[in-house]
């Protein structure tokens, strides 16, 4: 291995290991995240509005601050939040047995407090769940009591009281919240979120690969230490290929999607030469690398089932946003540090207006659906065809219509896609075979994911119901997929990447882009860059602040003496101005003050030697002047 690659990998791995920890942050990280006075953030309130669903349910920091407000101000509100948290934990519990039964018992105890006089008196003679009817509580308790004896308790038994608790919290408690310092602090975080982003926000590390318009490298946020992947789109290369609309489309779709199974966009900014997308860093490599370099011959069905389930969830989240992916293949499925997978590279994705079918020959040869190859109109079914190709390849170790590195013309591959029936070996179980056949049906109307579907975007439900995902198979080790837990990221992956490995080509093996000649950027391009350069993306940025403990460390409300911090006090601006007026002098102020003291001291020394300052001798004044000049000269030397 070349020395350049060893150094690049060592530095990158060291940064990766420190990512999110204090040693990964800049020494000046708190300066990057200084809160302004809350009055400067009032425009954020007008811009974002005040709906409960936005502030508490969609904004991670908003939810934490609302819960903090409830805990600090009202026991009833706090109990409501605790109830919601326990129900959410119950519904996504890792264990369908004893752990879930224990949680159900704890939730029942909370609901039973309506008849508990001791608890009632501790909350101003009103129990926390007084807004729930006796019928709702008794029905829920009865169902939960029976569930505590079930081997696998139902996950939805608390859905009705949960819904009613939400309705309660969004009324009076939330109205009180937006009048407090906790909401002002939320606005301060939103203000920080809106600040401009540039190249100085990040440290850059080794190149990981190439995109269509530039390099992809690892980067680290200076303020938080969190690691990301930086995808560069060279401005001149984008313009030369007339790809402005394509680039902006990818950025806007990434910004719109918030799914744990699709790479997230955290920042978008520009430099002099490039448009930059800062994305989720996936350290585990792509499925193509694992399939052909580490596991030639294919994966076992248990591993295939896990990857296929997470990919299905990722496509479901895209389809619910009316986004068609159109480029499913092994190299576009990336593994994270723990072995979970995400869909990447949304350059060919498109938003379907009113779910209307579209037309266009895009994709990768061998993975494009027959209707794309035949240049017909298509909809979400082409993505389910891609899932079929991917599952087949993961099991068989090769694509269904083309051998790896096979020398074959594009026309021949497209003929196979249109006409040939894929062949199945003994590697496929019966469930895997029927799943692939259903997904690889030539006619979209008969394809799995496109049949018996009320809405076109609901095809994932049909696939999730297939026996491959919902039945156990002792021969392959396959078990039913716990979809709720999988969506919460609580299912342990069957494979975990080595944290000390770099799943990327050597630095010197990644080809560099040639210089683009004959392209000049003008004012029209600047207008386009303004649409692209939008800075932080809200939810990923807030999650970053929480994960790296920046939120916990900065979210203080009181000084050591118990007084409110200046940026939350109504007179805080005046306080800060007064503080700055009497603050520690700057360098030059301290320097000249020191020299003045030296001059005064020299005069005092002369006085001690018997020099009459009332009637100075001819030598006294020159001595003082010489001392002053020496001080000035010394000052000039110090400044240089």
UniProtKB/Swiss-Prot annotation:
EC number(s) on file: 2.7.11.16
Catalytic residues of the enzyme: 327 (proton acceptor)
Domain Protein kinase: 202-469
Keyword terms: ATP-binding, Kinase, Nucleotide-binding, Phosphoprotein, Serine/threonine-protein kinase, Transferase
N-terminal: annotated segments: 1-201
UniProt xrefs under Pfam families: Pkinase, RGS
Binding site for ATP: 208-216, 231
Domain RGS: 52-187
Annotated GO biological process: regulation of signal transduction; signal transduction
Family recorded in the similarity comment: Belongs to the protein kinase superfamily. AGC Ser/Thr protein kinase family. GPRK subfamily.
Function: Specifically phosphorylates the activated forms of G protein-coupled receptors.
PANTHER family assigned to the protein according to its UniProt record, in alphabetical order: G PROTEIN-COUPLED RECEPTOR KINASE 2 (PTHR24355:SF28), G PROTEIN-COUPLED RECEPTOR KINASE/RIBOSOMAL PROTEIN S6 KINASE (PTHR24355)
Name of this protein: G protein-coupled receptor kinase 1
Organism of derivation: Caenorhabditis briggsae
GN (gene name): grk-1
């Amino acid at each position: 291995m070349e020395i350049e690659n060893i150094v690049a990998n060592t530095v990158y791995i060291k940064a990766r290991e420190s990512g999110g920890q204090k040693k990964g942050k800049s020494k000046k990280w708190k300066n990057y995240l200084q809160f302004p006075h809350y009055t400067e953030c009032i425009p954020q309130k007008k811009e974002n509005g005040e709906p409960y669903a936005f502030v508490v349910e969609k904004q991670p920091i908003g939810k934490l601050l609302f819960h903090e407000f409830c805990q600090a101000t009202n026991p009833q509100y706090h109990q409501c939040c605790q109830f919601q948290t326990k129900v959410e934990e119950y519904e996504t519990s890792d264990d369908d047995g004893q752990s879930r039964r224990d949680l159900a018992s704890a939730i029942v105890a909370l609901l039973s407090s309506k008849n508990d006089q001791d608890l009632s008196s501790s909350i101003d003679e009103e129990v926390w769940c007084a807004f729930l009817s006796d019928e709702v509580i008794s029905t829920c308790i009865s169902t939960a009591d029976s569930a505590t004896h079930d081997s696998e308790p139902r996950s939805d038994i608390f859905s009705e009281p949960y819904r009613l608790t939400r309705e309660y919290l969004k009324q009076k408690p939330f109205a009180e919240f937006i009048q407090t310092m906790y909401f002002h602090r939320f606005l301060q975080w939103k203000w920080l979120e809106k600040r401009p982003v540039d190249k100085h926000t990040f440290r850059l590390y080794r190149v990981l690969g190439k995109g269509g318009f530039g390099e992809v490298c690892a980067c680290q946020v200076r303020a938080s230490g969190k690691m990301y992947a930086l995808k560069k789109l060279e401005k001149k290369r984008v313009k030369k290929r007339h790809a402005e609309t394509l680039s902006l489309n990818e950025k806007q779709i990434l910004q719109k999607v918030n799914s744990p199974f699709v790479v997230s966009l955290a920042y978008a900014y520009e430099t002099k030469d490039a448009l930059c997308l800062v994305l989720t860093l996936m350290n585990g490599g792509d499925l193509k690398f694992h399939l052909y370099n580490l596991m030639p011959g294919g994966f076992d069905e248990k591993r295939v089932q896990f990857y296929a389930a997470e990919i299905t969830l990722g496509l479901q989240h895209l389809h619910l946003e009316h986004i068609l992916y159109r480029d499913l293949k092994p190299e576009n499925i990336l593994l994270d540090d723990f072995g979970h997978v995400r869909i990447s590279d949304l350059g060919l994705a498109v938003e379907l207006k009113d779910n209307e079918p579209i037309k266009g020959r895009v994709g990768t040869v061998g993975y494009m659906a027959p209707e794309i190859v035949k240049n017909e109109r298509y909809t979400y079914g082409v993505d389910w065809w891609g899932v079929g190709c991917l599952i087949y390849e993961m099991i068989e170790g090769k694509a269904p219509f083309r051998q790896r590195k096979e020398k074959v013309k594009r026309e021949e591959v497209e003929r196979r896609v249109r006409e040939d029936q894929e062949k199945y070996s003994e590697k496929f179980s019966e469930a895997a075979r029927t799943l692939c056949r259903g997904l690889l049906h030539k006619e979209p109307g008969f394809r799995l994911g496109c049949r018996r579907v009320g809405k076109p975007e609901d095809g994932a439900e049909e696939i999730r119901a297939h026996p491959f995902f919902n039945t156990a198979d002792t021969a392959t080790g396959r078990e039913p997929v716990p979809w709720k837990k999988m969506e919460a990221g609580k299912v342990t992956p069957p494979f975990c990447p080595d944290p000390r490995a770099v799943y990327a080509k050597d630095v010197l093996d990644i080809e560099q882009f040639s210089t683009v000649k004959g392209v000049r950027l003008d004012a029209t391009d600047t207008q386009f860059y303004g649409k692209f350069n939008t800075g932080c993306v809200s939810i990923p940025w807030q999650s970053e602040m929480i994960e790296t403990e920046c939120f916990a460390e900065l979210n203080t409300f009181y000084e050591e003496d118990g007084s409110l911090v200046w940026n939350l006090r109504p007179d805080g601006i005046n306080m800060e101005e007064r503080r700055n007026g009497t603050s520690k002098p700057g360098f030059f102020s301290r320097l000249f003050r020191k020299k003045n003291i030296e001059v005064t001291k020299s005069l005092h020394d002369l006085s001690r030697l018997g020099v009459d300052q009332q009637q100075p001798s001819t030598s006294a004044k020159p001595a003082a002047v010489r001392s002053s000049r020496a001080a000035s000269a010394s000052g000039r030397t110090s400044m240089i």
